[in-house]
Amino acid sequence: MYLKDSKIIVIKIGSSLLIDDKKKVRRKWLTEFAKDIQELIKQNKKVIIVSSGAIAMGCKKLNISKKNLKIDKSQAVASIGQIELMNLFSETFVKLKINISQILLTLEDTEQRRRALNAKRTFDNLFKLGFVPIVNENDTIATSEIKYGDNDRLASRVAQISGADSLILLSDVDGLYTHNPKIYKNAKLIKEIRNIDKDIEKIATKSISEHGTGGMKTKIDAAKICQLSGCQMVIANGLVNRPIKKITEENKCTWFLPKVSKLDARKKWIISSVSPKGALIIDDGAKQALSNGKSLLAAGIKKVSGRFSKGDHIKVLDKNNYECARGLSSFSSNEIEKIMGHHSKEIEKLLGYISKSEVIHKDDIVEV
């Protein structure tokens, strides 16, 4: 499909695209990028921009280095830089009559289904009003425990929530190479990836840019989420003028094709949870039942790992600790420890109150 047939497109911009190594804002680049957005809008495509740069812009304003910033200070710097960042977008986009809005998200906003659905409605309403949402992680309130840490994975969740057809990750590299192209001259660009296997993960290398926190590993993680959400993803070099136009004309990039055409919206959200709260280790019989589309019952659970509450995302592991599924638990970890290994009819007696018979209902579990 690539971009031609995409109705909703999410575009992620890295900090290194907005600010160069000398801490100068790339205004000319942003103007050319805005022309790409204008062209997409003319094609009746809905666009969301996920932009890094709040902390980088804050550091520029304060004339300090981003390196070794502690999280409390980085939150203050982000607060300063966020205004600078949005002013930059506003000044540039208004010249092309592109209306923009701002959305700040945290990890919890995409992990909790109610918040995720609220975000979806907000995106839909902004599209109807003719606005281009500009999204960033809310660095001013996010802590290390509830933080994405990079905008690649945030962009993949935004793509998932908004129902996007394509996610474009613009970076300082052309895509995924067989080796690090900055070191090996014989490195070859991988044009298309259908399956992210161990070999693909192995060759993912870290970015060495001054302002970016991502690197190829986080882009691979983002691709996994997209592939399981029916969304295609592309990694492309954004340092060129008109980067979106370059993708369509030259295709010098790496495309990750979706594994599925469509997943139930609820299961999309379950499968790509960034931070499962715990895990259940199950026996072979329970694993086979899951493969047959059945619910997970207490009788097949051998061990509980971690502390979690009813409704939390959890992993399901087989006896070899291999992740075979993810789901939403109908019980807390304390409750499961009391009922595991027992028949469903015994649950009321063991807990002292009436509850569900399934630890994870079949509608709330997805095999991985």
From Swiss-Prot:
EC assignment: 2.7.2.11
Pfam families to which the protein is assigned, alphabetical: AA_kinase, PUA
Binding site for ATP: K12, S171, D172, T213, G214, G215, M216, K217, T218, K219
Gene Ontology cellular component terms for the protein in this record: cytosol
Highest taxon of the lineage: Bacteria
Transmembrane segments: none
A GO molecular function held by the record: glutamate 5-kinase activity
Pathway: Amino-acid biosynthesis; L-proline biosynthesis; L-glutamate 5-semialdehyde from L-glutamate: step 1/2
Reaction(s) this enzyme catalyzes, per UniProt: L-glutamate + ATP = L-glutamyl 5-phosphate + ADP
One of the GO biological process terms: L-proline biosynthetic process
Protein residues bound to substrate: S52, D139, N151
Residue span, PUA domain: 277-354
Alphabetical list of SMART domains matching this protein: PUA
InterPro entries, per database record: AceGlu_kinase-like_sf, Asp/Glu/Uridylate_kinase, G5K_ProB, Glu/AcGlu_kinase, Glu_5kinase, Glu_5kinase/COase_Synthase, Glutamate_5-kinase_CS, PUA
Subcellular location: Cytoplasm
Ligase in keyword set: no
Function summary: Catalyzes the transfer of a phosphate group to glutamate to form L-glutamate 5-phosphate.
PANTHER family: GLUTAMATE 5-KINASE, ISOPENTENYL PHOSPHATE KINASE
Name of the protein: Glutamate 5-kinase
Natural source organism: Pelagibacter ubique (strain HTCC1062)
Gene: proB
